[in-house]
């Protein structure tokens, strides 16, 4: 397993990505075809920036990527990507202005993850809280027909979370990329075709 992980780490370094997580997004795009040239994309939990770099490349010069993370990063981003260090749980004027500048979004992606404690229940609960925050950003900023990708730790509350997304999207899928560690509890939920919120 260590050799398997090292493969992705070395590949990321060779291809100038700051983290191996880029290959998870690459697999997600290959499976669900969520990216296109000219899109507006919001990347939550963006540091150190691999997903942002991949997204910027996929949307091209006519697209825009807004990357947000509570942590800073030294990664250099292309002109079509903007990185903002901010807490998504705090609606600061700077964060709201940055989010609203590119409205509407074609795609919102979230690789947000909590600092793990080793306590399974606590880690799952903290992951769910981040996923709920990402979901709450969707209604006012994702365009009709847009897509949503969110990382979540598997647990008893996942079904209820998925059910909430089914009320918002035409299709909702679970997907665990091959580049995820086999023993990892993380997987991704993909919402395709945003319809709005059912009343």
From Swiss-Prot:
For this protein, what is the EC number?
2.1.1.166
Q: What is its main location?
A: cytoplasm
The EC category is transferase
Give the subcellular location. Answer: Cytoplasm
- Catalytic residues of the enzyme: 151 (proton acceptor)
The reply on keyword S-adenosyl-L-methionine is yes
Q: Name one GO molecular function term.
A: rRNA (uridine-2'-O-)-methyltransferase activity
Catalytic activity line of the entry: uridine(2552) in 23S rRNA + S-adenosyl-L-methionine = 2'-O-methyluridine(2552) in 23S rRNA + S-adenosyl-L-homocysteine + H(+)
Q: Which SUPFAM superfamilies match?
A: S-adenosyl-L-methionine-dependent methyltransferases
GO CC entries: cytoplasm
Q: Which UniProt keywords apply?
A: Cytoplasm, Methyltransferase, rRNA processing, S-adenosyl-L-methionine, Transferase
Q: Which residues bind S-adenosyl-L-methionine?
A: 49, 51, 69, 87, 111
Q: What does this protein do?
A: Specifically methylates the uridine in position 2552 of 23S rRNA at the 2'-O position of the ribose in the fully assembled 50S ribosomal subunit.
The family classification in the record reads: Belongs to the class I-like SAM-binding methyltransferase superfamily. RNA methyltransferase RlmE family.
Kindly give the PANTHER family that the UniProt entry links to this protein: RIBOSOMAL RNA METHYLTRANSFERASE, RRNA METHYLTRANSFERASE 2, MITOCHONDRIAL
Q: What is this protein called?
A: Ribosomal RNA large subunit methyltransferase E
